[in-house]
Structure formats: C-alpha cells, structure tokens
Amino acid sequence: MVTEQDPTTLMKQQVGKAAAEEVKSGMIVGLGTGSTTAYMIQFLGELLQRGELKDIKGIPTSFQSTVLAKKYGVPLTTLDEVDYMDIAIDGADEVDPQKNLIKGGGAAHTREKIVDCLAEKFVVVVDSSKLVDKLGSTFLLPVEVIPMAMNPVIRAIEKLGGQPEVRMGVKKAGPIVTDQGNLVIDVKFDSIDNPGELEKSLNNIPGVLENGLFVGVADVILVGEIDNGKPIVRTIS
C-alpha cells in the first residue's frame, strides 16, 4: 500500500495518471518502459474498463510494457499493422532544459527511440528528480552494442572521451541482454556539451545499434512534484 511517506511513488502515480488522460478514444499509443510509465499503462486499463476510453491500441516498447498492457487489458498492435501513431508516452532518466533526454535505464532505449520518434506527439513522464541542468550529470549514457563488437566499440568510445563499462545483471550472472539480444555499455562523459553531435558520433561507430540520447524528440514533459506535501503535475511544453 502506498503511504504519504512514499513521495516518489506518489509523484509517479500522479504523473502516470495525467499522462493516461492525454490519450483519447481511437488513438494508437506508444507504450513506454519504466516505473512511471507502468502507472500510465495501469491507468489506461482502468479508463478502458470504466468505458471512458474506447478503441485504443498500444504499441509496446519492451517486454515489460507488453506484459503490463496484457495485465491491465490494453489492446496491442505492431508497427507492421499501423502507418500512424497518435501519441507515445515514455519515461526518462534525465531531462535537460531543452527537453533533451537520456533514456535506457531499462535497456529498452532502442525500441523506445523507434516508437517515440514515429509518434505525432511524444509525452515524457518523470518525477522531479530527473530534471538536470546538463545531460550526464547524474546518469550514465547507455549504448546498445552487438556482442561481437563490444571491445572495438569500447575503444572507439574511449577515443570520444567516454569512460565505458559493460552493464552487468543484478541477480543474474553475466551482462544484461536487451530484448534484441545485444549488450549495453554505460558511458560516463565528463561533460555532454552537444548532445545532438554526440548522439550521431556514437551511432556512427560500427557495432552500435543505438544510444540513449533523445535530442529534439520530446514535445511535452509531465513532471511529478510534491507541493505542500501533496503530489502535483507540472507541464513543460
């Protein structure tokens, strides 16, 4: 049970609910990955059950969002079956003042970037702890890599000034494996002064599938905050 002593969860629930209310009947919805987005999927299911939403279909960005959508009764489709997506709702690990993002804490950033970039509107849901002045301040930058290219990619990233390390599993022996069967390298940069340039440079390394920089993609940021002991949602557009 959630209590008032758990402000982070309260913020995530509130912003997840606000994001679900952005969805209208008949929409195709990109379903993001992460703890805040999980509440959004739950609230979408509740709106469908109450009849307040009808005829929506979700496109999941990960195995996690697929499982949650099925659990809460959100119908699913695929990019093969639709040629238009009304809205994508997803979380982020960092958000800078220009609405650029670092994503990939859940190792799903490749699928997330595909879905989020295809949507007509991309809404980001975060709690206030994810707001930073400069990307890379608190979170390492994830890079998805084809396994055979891991060592060459590490060397190339070091030449770009990064400090890379392979992400290892928790309660699992060995590295994290993505839904695509690849590895994730988490990279520390002393300063990410030009996120757009770095995003392109990393993706130009042979063996890199995608990195967690999302530059110029987000349309709206919904931020969960605590004001006078109560959770509120602030909109950055």
UniProtKB/Swiss-Prot annotation:
Gene3D superfamilies assigned to the protein according to its UniProt record, in alphabetical order: 3.30.70.260, 3.40.50.1360
Involved pathway(s): Carbohydrate degradation; pentose phosphate pathway; D-ribose 5-phosphate from D-ribulose 5-phosphate (non-oxidative stage): step 1/1
Any one GO CC term of the record: cytosol
First-tier enzyme category under EC: isomerase
Entry's Gene Ontology molecular function annotations: ribose-5-phosphate isomerase activity
Binding site for substrate: T33, G34, S35, T36, D90, G91, A92, D93, K103, G104, G105, G106, K130
InterPro entries linked to this entry: NagB/RpiA_transferase-like (IPR037171), Ribose5P_isomerase_typA_subgr (IPR020672), Ribose5P_isomerase_type_A (IPR004788)
Pfam families on file: Rib_5-P_isom_A (PF06026)
GO process terms (BP): D-ribose metabolic process; pentose-phosphate shunt, non-oxidative branch
Assigned EC number: 5.3.1.6
Catalytic activity: aldehydo-D-ribose 5-phosphate = D-ribulose 5-phosphate
Active site, renumbered: E112 (proton acceptor)
Keywords of the record: Isomerase
Family: Belongs to the ribose 5-phosphate isomerase family.
Stated name of the protein: Ribose-5-phosphate isomerase A
Annotated source species: Trichodesmium erythraeum (strain IMS101)
Lineage: Bacteria, Bacillati, Cyanobacteriota, Cyanophyceae, Oscillatoriophycideae
